[in-house]
């Protein structure tokens, strides 16, 4: 999708079943569902600007059962992008379903998937208490990125470039962040796991899986209103159908008008 001076593409890894064990198992139509699990989709995004090649989160990578970073790299290759071409990886947080693709195992060692990229994350996420498999995954990822000098930490709200704005949200994790990408008077809004699906635009709830459910709900309400008022393009990382859309007012509330990316 062309949007202002940006070219935007979803890089879907597909659908997965996941249970309380936090194990992501790829799911195909016709597969028997695993008892006690939910369906979830995972989709990083590629954004090409006049001066940058950006990734918004990196998917599961090796943290999906039987998978590696091939799905992500194949998705990039489909759009003519090599791993060496990526200039920045913008991370909403470091749960392994968002940051797993940051590294790949090479000769039994975690190695950055994108050798020329800066990996940008809120500083607080390096020590945020996850309390599950994401702790070990986070530490492995951070160690590899820091060793290669590719880890860039930010604090609070600010701008990386004239195009890239970051804002601390908390909510889903203690130091979760969102990104606003600006081009030719337009804005792309990537809410990470604070606004991961279009269904969360139209429903009010506090999720038990959030670090602070009330904060996440407050941010969802604010971001949906912001996107509707500003005409922003919203990207939905965990949606099973609508990966991007414009939010507008409808009778009785808000609605999402899907667009293809």
Model-identified regions with their sequence ranges:
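Conserved beta-strand hairpin/beta-sheet module of binuclear metal-dependent hydrolase folds
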Residues: 2-8, 12-79, 178-192
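Cap/insert and terminal regions of metallo-dependent hydrolase folds
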Residues: 185-187, 191-261
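Short, P/G- and charge-enriched loop/turn segments at secondary-structure junctions
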Residues: 30-36, 107-108, 166-167
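Active-site metal-binding motif and surrounding structural segment of the metallo-beta-lactamase
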Residues: 68-120
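Active-site metal-binding loops of divalent metal-dependent hydrolases
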Residues: 13-15, 58-61, 94, 124-125, ...
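Residue-level marker for buried hydrophobic side chains located in beta-strands
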Residues: 54-56, 90, 119, 188-190, ...
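Metallo-beta-lactamase
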Residues: 77-78, 85, 104, 113-168, ...
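Histidine-centered catalytic micro-motifs
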Residues: 89-99, 169-176, 235-241
């Amino acid at each position: 999708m062309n949007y202002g001076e940006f070219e935007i593409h979803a890089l879907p890894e597909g659908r997965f079943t996941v249970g309380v064990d936090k194990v992501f198992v790829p799911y195909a139509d016709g597969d028997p569902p695993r008892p006690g699990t939910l369906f979830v989709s995972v989709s990083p995004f590629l954004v090409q600007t006049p001066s940058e090649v950006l990734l918004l989160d990196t998917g599961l990578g090796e943290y999906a059962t039987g998978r590696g970073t091939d799905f992500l790299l194949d998705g990039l290759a489909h759009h003519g992008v090599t791993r060496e071409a990526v200039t920045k990886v913008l991370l909403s947080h470091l749960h392994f379903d968002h940051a797993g693709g940051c590294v790949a195992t090479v000769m039994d060692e975690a190695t950055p998937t994108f050798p020329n990229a800066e990996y940008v994350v809120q500083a607080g996420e390096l020590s945020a208490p996850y309390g599950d498999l994401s702790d070990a995954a986070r530490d492995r990822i951070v160690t590899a990125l820091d060793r290669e000098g590719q880890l860039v930490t930010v604090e609070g709200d600010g701008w990386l470039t004239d195009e890239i704005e970051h804002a601390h949200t908390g909510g889903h994790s203690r130091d979760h962040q969102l990104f606003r990408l600006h081009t030719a008077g337009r804005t792309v809004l990537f809410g990470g796991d604070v606004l991961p699906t279009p269904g969360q635009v139209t429903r009010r709830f506090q999720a038990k899986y959030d670090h602070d459910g009330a904060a996440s709900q407050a941010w969802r309400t604010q971001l949906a209103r912001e996107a509707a008022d500003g005409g922003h393009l919203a990207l939905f990382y965990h949606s099973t159908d609508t990966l991007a859309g414009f939010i507008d007012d409808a009778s009785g509330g808000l609605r999402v008008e899907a667009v293809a990316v």
